[in-house]
């Protein structure tokens, strides 16, 4: 995990240790699931973390793809991410995930981390998944994560979002099983799925803020202990209800030889 004093200024929406946890969980997911080759062309579907936080992953995925692309609907977010990460072989641009300005079958890997759960309807979610499947090459892999609607605390978070109490508005989301079906309907083959990050949403945020206020830098140890305890919930049968995000890995089938 990075030094918390270095991370604090760039993770205004997450405790530094939580940002480091989220980053490592997603990087581990990419290492185990997407496995991009050094020649791969990889797309990440939003740049909020790259623009604002220490939970960024686009420029940390290994093995390093030859070309990294990132899109976001908000031009200021794209510009901020570009200022933070001046990377050769990277292309960051403003684009709608439902209407990608990307050629069909041109990407080797796609990472969509809690992007599509900001869309307004399941129809828009379906359109975005179809569009992502379109730009993926045959044999290419995609990882999609969404807010988990089976987590009871998600609905409190959604209520606060509707009241304007959050820096972003939550949109539609679906269960892991429905996400799997929607990906299959685009023609993709689903390979794996799991739940990610079991910190109790909002509750842990308030708790960590209180610990930081009381203990300052000395709060690192109790917060790290709590994060390990929450992570252990992934081993329980209740993980479908404690996970903050559903994650699904899918692959675009390679047409059989001679198929038209």
Describe each PLM feature range.
Residues 1-43, 141-165:
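Conserved class I S-adenosyl-L-methionine
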Residues 21, 162-178:
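Acceptor-substrate binding/catalytic loop of class I
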Residues 111:
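A conserved beta-strand element that flanks and buttresses the S-adenosyl-L-methionine
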Residues 114-118:
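Short catalytic micro-motifs in class I SAM-dependent methyltransferases
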Residues 119-131:
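A short, conserved alpha-helix within the catalytic core of class I
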Residues 192, 196-260:
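A C-terminal cap/extension of S-adenosyl-L-methionine-dependent methyltransferases
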């Amino acid at each position: 995990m990075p030094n918390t004093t270095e991370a604090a200024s760039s993770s205004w929406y997450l405790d530094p240790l939580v940002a480091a946890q989220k980053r490592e969980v997603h990087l581990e997911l990419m290492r185990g699931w997407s496995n991009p080759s050094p020649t791969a062309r990889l797309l990440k579907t939003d740049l909020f973390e790259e623009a604002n936080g220490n939970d960024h992953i686009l420029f940390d995925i290994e093995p390093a793809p030859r070309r990294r692309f990132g899109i976001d609907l908000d031009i200021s977010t794209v510009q901020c991410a570009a200022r933070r990460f001046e990377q050769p072989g990277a292309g960051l641009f403003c684009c709608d995930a439902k209407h990608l300005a990307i050629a069909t079958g041109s990407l080797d890997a796609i990472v969509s981390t809690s992007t599509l759960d900001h869309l307004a309807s399941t129809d828009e979610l379906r359109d975005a998944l179809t569009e992502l499947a379109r730009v993926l090459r045959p044999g290419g892999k995609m990882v999609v994560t969404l807010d988990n609607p089976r987590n009871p605390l998600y609905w409190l978070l959604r209520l606060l979002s509707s009241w304007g109490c959050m820096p972003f508005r939550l949109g539609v989301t679906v269960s892991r099983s429905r996400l799997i079906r929607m990906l299959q309907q685009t023609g993709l083959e689903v390979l794996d799925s799991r739940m990610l990050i079991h910190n109790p949403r909002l509750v842990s945020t308030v708790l960590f803020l209180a610990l930081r206020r009381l203990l300052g830098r000395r709060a690192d140890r109790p917060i790290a202990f709590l994060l390990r305890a929450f992570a252990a919930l992934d081993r329980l049968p209740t993980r479908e209800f404690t996970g903050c995000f559903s994650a699904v890995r899918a692959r675009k089938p390679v047409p059989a030889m001679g198929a038209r």
